[in-house]
């Protein structure tokens, strides 16, 4: 069991060093910028490498302690990648519009998740007798809408222990809610980002698909390493184990062997 490895060359090949046009920058990002080329800011990957590794260690510590990590990326080029890698490591995701209060008003969100489950049971069990085609169509649309918004967190069972965010400008609501609740945030910060409020910043390109894929693979791998450590501590055969949601592991592991969340 070990954290995934990566190199600066890998980050360069993924285009992680390209920031935005120099006119679209946040001066608070100046410490993380190497310079500019053709009116585009170049991010200092010599800082990114250790900061990315530190973020991976933090994610690993959370999942090793049975904690939950919420992946957030609603921009078009991040949606599929975020969902894929959150599922890969048995974690959770929001890859469509962030609903205001998704964290700070969890009670209301929980009611919406219950409604989604009820609708899924009705459709799955064929419990639609007595409904007109129009009523069935309307319920189907409601289910699809709820699933798009909440499908990635319907198994989360409570607030996450950490957020991993792609594009803090677009996901400013998520950052603000996490800060309000004191939840640690791992996030990719581009040249137009505000690094304030980010517990574990990762300076890098948050627009290129290859860059997003690289971050998500590494963070997902770190989460898996933590889960494997927890399974090993609980005496589970890691080689035969299947990655399952974190709260399931926490429920099954002996209480004395669960490690505190970082």
From Swiss-Prot:
Cystine residue pairs: none
Molecular function per GO: structural constituent of ribosome
A GO BP annotation: translation
Xref: CDD domains: RPS2
Gene3D superfamilies the UniProt entry points to: Glucose-6-phosphate isomerase like protein, domain 1, Helix hairpin bin
A GO cellular component annotation in the UniProt record: cytosolic small ribosomal subunit
Origin superkingdom: Bacteria
Entry keyword rRNA-binding: no
Keywords: Ribonucleoprotein, Ribosomal protein
SUPFAM superfamilies attached to this UniProt entry: Ribosomal protein S2
Pfam families attached to this UniProt entry: Ribosomal_S2
Family per similarity comment: Belongs to the universal ribosomal protein uS2 family.
Record-given protein name: Small ribosomal subunit protein uS2
Source species: Rhodospirillum rubrum (strain ATCC 11170 / ATH 1.1.1 / DSM 467 / LMG 4362 / NCIMB 8255 / S1)
